[in-house]
Amino acid sequence: MERKALVAISVVLILAVAGIAAALFIGGGEKPITINQKGSDTMLELCQVWAEEFHGEYESISVIVSGGGSGTGITALISGTVDVAQASRQMKQSEIDQAIAAGITPVEFRVAIDGIAIIVHTSNPIEVLTLDQLRGIYNGTYVNWKDLGGLDMPIVAYGRQSTSGTYMYFQETVLKNENYTTNMQQMAGNSAIVQAIMNDEGGIGYVGIGYAAKASGIKILNLSKDMPSLSYSPLDKDAVIDGDYVLSRYLYLYTAGTPTGALREYLLWILTDGQPIAEEIGFYALPDQIIEEELEKLE
């Protein structure tokens, strides 16, 4: 009887192990993992496509991406409510200090390159602006296109909301930290600005190149540092990557500490397989040297 009992127990154990193995096989062999990510609206479409493609290759790992602006994503990372923040600007020192005080060491990854596009209505005859002229438009110095060699038509400036990384980058780079004109129309996202410019002959706005390149009904202006300097388009990939285009910038992902496990796989994938997708969405892939530097942060 004792031998029969032992045999019966052994059979039960074998069937149990087999059942567990079968369940693991059916489920992909790994426990489902969810990565939460939030931040830049400029990067929202890019990050959503990255998340979808990554999940296609790593079925057990899901990445939930939402927008709200770079500042919103960074705040969420500091509070520990997301695993990753996408940002179209670098973290400010005050934000880094807040993170460290909260016990979080933010790690920065450059993941793509953007050239902020200055867009106007297709009927606007202006083709080129200098950085000073652009600053004058957004600080309220210029209020009519005729002052810039254009038509006698009021200028309507469109920009982003204050939580946007692009809002802050533009204020630092173009306005030299001056205030925006109080007449600027603050819009919720890049698509809203594109739509506004399509319907406003006097309008001017700034959007990520990933949005401008795919839009119709708008014109993308060339920019120059000053009047004697050459002007460049954000559609000129070499000019953006080399920094000749004056509004070139990196796009970032931030993690709380050096990523491990599934999060490390996600960052590794973005810096390798994800780079061609950045080009497909309309942004620019990182140069090889920059990729090597970012990959070293995962070692």
Predicted regions and their residues:
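Exported/periplasmic ABC-transporter solute-binding proteins
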Residues: 5-9, 16-18, 23-299
